[in-house]
UniProtKB/Swiss-Prot annotation:
<dbReference type="Pfam" id="PF00449">
    <property type="entry name" value="Urease_alpha"/>
</dbReference>
<keyword id="KW-0479">Metal-binding</keyword>
<feature type="modified residue" description="N6-carboxylysine">
    <location>
        <position position="217"/>
    </location>
</feature>
<feature type="binding site">
    <location>
        <position position="136"/>
    </location>
    <ligand>
        <name>Ni(2+) 1</name>
    </ligand>
</feature>
<comment type="subunit">
    <text>Heterotrimer of UreA (gamma), UreB (beta) and UreC (alpha) subunits. Three heterotrimers associate to form the active enzyme.</text>
</comment>
<dbReference type="InterPro" id="IPR005848">
    <property type="entry name" value="Urease_asu"/>
</dbReference>
<dbReference type="InterPro" id="IPR029754">
    <property type="entry name" value="Urease_Ni-bd"/>
</dbReference>
<keyword id="KW-0963">Cytoplasm</keyword>
<dbReference type="InterPro" id="IPR032466">
    <property type="entry name" value="Metal_Hydrolase"/>
</dbReference>
<dbReference type="InterPro" id="IPR011059">
    <property type="entry name" value="Metal-dep_hydrolase_composite"/>
</dbReference>
<protein>
    <recommendedName>
        <fullName>Urease subunit alpha</fullName>
        <ecNumber>3.5.1.5</ecNumber>
    </recommendedName>
</protein>
<feature type="domain" description="Urease">
    <location>
        <begin position="129"/>
        <end position="567"/>
    </location>
</feature>
<feature type="binding site">
    <location>
        <position position="360"/>
    </location>
    <ligand>
        <name>Ni(2+) 1</name>
    </ligand>
</feature>
<dbReference type="InterPro" id="IPR006680">
    <property type="entry name" value="Amidohydro-rel"/>
</dbReference>
<feature type="active site" description="Proton donor">
    <location>
        <position position="320"/>
    </location>
</feature>
<dbReference type="InterPro" id="IPR011612">
    <property type="entry name" value="Urease_alpha_N_dom"/>
</dbReference>
<dbReference type="Pfam" id="PF01979">
    <property type="entry name" value="Amidohydro_1"/>
</dbReference>
Length: 567
């Protein structure tokens, strides 16, 4: 029997069981838990390699073979960190297993035929496309920035750079919902729209859901009163959609206790639950300990650094239409920015009390940094808090699974789309991101949308090969023409499907129906289920979770930063 060194094997086919991989320049390492390969039967494409006619490629017709195979990929997902070949058929993940030619190779369940394309993923990491659940649709160019960062699904609201959209994630009313659904039909990213949830009577909310809103957003700038909260959640329970909330910073219509009383035991997604992005001052963070509250963060406070507080004051004045010459407006801004709660937020993420991360795109958040900042928090918390049980000093698999769930499966489950997107699992849309380990979470090697490459770094178009400088991200064929419609999904509620809204608006994209929103609870948040008793000192803003004081120093240096962004 022939032998090969572990290093030579990893160089040729990627890491296998027991090998460890560093994630970019972070302090995080993953260890391969399982390898679906049969040693000696690995498939690889190229001159003199395995995937050739009669060898690793069989004779089957297209109906029996994969449309696309990613070979020897290191999959990092909430369910595991494994090495496998990934088979894609009709734009969906068909098989995770062993690729090759079943006529001559044993154990093949990912058949390769003459109709199969190949992406060489050996030495690469594959993750699910990110789900950003806090999008202000201020400009369509956000889609390019998000795709280039590894995000493939948007949940949010807006109508463009209108004053209301600059501040709130709402697409208000049937007319605007129709126009935004039609506009989204040509954007190469999955989209679900949130309507405006601020109403004390239900009819105007019901008509927005029937018009295509997959959720409703309660925002203090429209008046997040107990009456509006109760009414909105009542309609959500009736029509199985999610409610997201930005609570009352000024405590005008009530305090955190009043909001929690209005919510009752009904499921709700609390945006920027720390509070710098808005919410009851100073203690909205307490909501993260409730069983029915699904808490998320927006990325400007992630992680806590020496620059976080100063940056936030200016952002807030612009986004919420405040006037620095008005003392009350300045006081409003300053009440939201608290070092103590921002520092506690990182720790609560590491404990699994905060379940999701998101952007707050162009409205106190950066649409292209959801993935990057999530992993910066994970790195920073490893330095501050050490390994998370059951991790060891040598691998961080559990912490990695906890953090990747925050921007993939958990927002998908929260908004009732987890059956379509949010993980690398059979049956789901093939929205996949390939990373070189050295560039993990910073710059994808390529992004697949519905099984087709939608964006990738590309060199000089007049070059003799694809790699000469200048290399930058460019739209690929999956972003063009009718291919967009075959590889992207618009999400609609059942009420809109029942009235035939997709046909009425002549939507050409795939349609996904949200469901199960009202059943999701904190224990359903994958790897992020903790429900601590959170207390905030009203004078000092110190935060305690189950009696433990949550404090950490701001970071002065981070990974995934200037080393990767010289220009």
């Amino acid at each position: 029997m022939s032998h090969i060194s572990r290093q030579a094997y990893a160089d040729m086919f990627g890491p296998t069981v027991g090998d460890r991989v560093r994630l970019a320049d972070t302090a995080l390492w993953v260890e391969v838990e399982k390898d679906f390969t049969i040693y000696g039967e690995e498939v690889k494409f190229g001159g003199g390699k395995v995937i050739r006619d009669g060898m690793g490629q069989g004779q089957m017709l297209a109906a029996e073979a994969m449309d696309l195979v990613l070979t020897n990929a290191l999959i990092i997902d909430h369910w595991g960190i494994v090495k496998a070949d990934i088979g894609i058929k009709h734009g969906r993940i068909a098989v995770i297993g062993k690729a090759g030619n079943p006529d001559v190779q044993p154990g093949v369940n990912v058949p390769v035929g003459p109709g199969t394309e190949v992406i060489a993923a050996e030495g690469k990491i594959v993750t699910a496309g990110g789900v950003d659940s806090h999008i202000h649709f201020i400009c369509p160019q956000q889609v390019d920035e998000a795709l280039n960062s590894g995000v493939t699904t948007f949940i949010g609201g807006g109508t463009g750079p209108a004053t209301g959209t600059n501040a709130t994630t709402c697409t208000p009313g049937p007319w605007y919902l129709a126009r935004m659904l039609q506009a989204a039909d040509s954007l190469p990213i999955n989209i679900g729209l949130l309507g405006k949830g601020n109403a004390s009577r239900p009819d105007a909310l019901r008509e927005q859901i029937a018009a295509g809103a997959v959720g409703l957003k309660l925002h203090e700038d429209w008046g997040s009163t107990p009456a509006a909260i109760d009414c909105c959640l009542g309609v959500a329970e009736e029509m199985d959609i999610q409610v997201a909330i930005h609570t009352d910073t000024l405590n005008e219509s009530g305090c955190i206790e009043d909001t929690l009383a209005a919510i009752g035991d009904r499921t709700i997604h609390t945006f920027h639950t720390e509070g710098a992005g808005g919410g009851h001052a100073p203690d909205i963070i307490r909501a993260a300990g409730q069983a029915n509250v699904l808490p998320s963060s927006t990325n400007p406070t992630l992680p806590y650094t020496i620059n976080t507080v100063d940056e936030h004051l200016d952002m807030l004045m612009v986004c919420h239409h405040l006037d620095p010459s008005i003392a009350e407006d300045v006081a409003f801004a300053e009440s939201r920015i608290r070092r103590e709660t921002i520092a506690a937020e990182d720790i609560l993420h590491d404990m699994g009390a905060f379940a999701m991360t998101s952007s707050d795109s162009q409205a106190m958040g950066r649409v292209g940094e959801v993935v990057l900042r999530t992993w910066q928090v994970a790195h920073q918390m490893k330095l501050r808090r050490g390994p998370l049980a059951p991790d060891t000093p040598y691998s961080d698999n559990f912490r990695v699974k906890r953090y990747i769930a925050k921007y993939t499966i958990n927002p998908a489950l929260t908004h009732g789309i987890g059956h379509e997107v949010g993980s690398v699992e059979v049956g789901k849309l093939a929205d996949l991101v390939l990373w070189s380990p050295a560039f993990f979470a910073v710059k994808p090697a390529l992004v697949l949308k519905g099984g087709m490459i939608v964006t990738a770094p590309m060199g000089d178009i007049n070059g003799s090969i694809p790699t000469p400088q200048p290399v930058h991200y460019r739209p690929m064929f999956g972003a063009l023409g009718a291919a967009r419609h075959a590889t992207r999904m618009t999400f609609l509620p059942q009420a809109a499907m029942d009235r035939g809204l997709a046909e009425e608006l002549n939507l050409r994209s795939l349609i996904g129906v949200v469901n199960g929103c009202r059943r999701v609870r904190k224990p359903d948040m994958v790897h992020n289920t903790l429900q601590p008793l959170i207390e905030v000192d009203a004078q000092t803003y110190q935060v305690r979770a189950d009696g433990e004081l949550l404090v950490c120093e701001p970071a002065s240096e981070l990974p995934l930063a200037q080393r990767y962004f010289l220009f």
